[in-house]
Amino acid sequence: MNRLFRLLPLASLVLTACSLHTPQGPGKSPDSPQWRQHQQAVRSLNQFQTRGAFAYLSDEQKVYARFFWQQTGQDRYRLLLTNPLGSTELSLTAQPGSVQLIDNKGQTYTATDAEEMIGRLTGMPIPLNSLRQWIIGLPGDATDYSLDDQYRLRELNYTQNGKTWHVTYGGYTSDTQPALPSNVELNNGAQRIKLKMDNWIVK
């Protein structure tokens, strides 16, 4: 399973637009009422989905893929990673107390922790438990963060299991209300994860 994504570097072209452009301008205070209002609006999104380009980069492996994220409830979501031909390389479905992962050979795995499972089976320590919040522009459990000049997350730092993740937001889309991220990068020094969202559908 650790070689699940051996063929995916062929998809590197899909990330040509995935370079980050950190928002410039004066930041705003995390104590501002505008930020609290934005957080409240984002937290009210119980169901949403997004798709786009995914990259995982480390000294051990480089993975490029297309991703699809569907949130159907507070603790219910589905993550798909597909190759350039559109075939599913990984399908992960999570709900409270249960996680199911199906690989590209149809093998099914079950566990109770999505983050531990995907790290163990793919060799990619993706912080899924926090990413569920970060992907929509919320800090989650992070307390060290800053805002851009539109009262949205610009960057954050979060230490988990001895690793400090630095998360930067390269932009937001104006196609949704509230505005949602269009470009996110996670970096802990040894690994980088890039997400470029093509679009959002919110309910």
From Swiss-Prot:
Lipid-acceptor residues (N-palmitoyl cysteine): 18
Taxonomic source organism: Klebsiella pneumoniae (strain 342)
Subcellular location: Cell outer membrane
Subunit-structure text: Monomer.
Keyword annotations: Cell outer membrane, Chaperone, Lipoprotein, Membrane, Palmitate, Protein transport, Signal, Transport
Signal peptide: 1-17
Family listed: Belongs to the LolB family.
Membrane topology listed for this record: Lipid-anchor
Keyword Thylakoid among record annotations: no
S-diacylglycerol cysteine-type lipidated residues: 18
Protein name: Outer-membrane lipoprotein LolB
Single GO BP term: protein transport
Any one GO CC term of the record: cell outer membrane
Free-text function comment from the UniProt entry: Plays a critical role in the incorporation of lipoproteins in the outer membrane after they are released by the LolA protein.
Xref: Gene3D superfamilies: Lipoprotein localisation LolA/LolB/LppX
InterPro entries hit by this protein: LolA/LolB/LppX (IPR029046), OM_lipoprot_LolB (IPR004565)
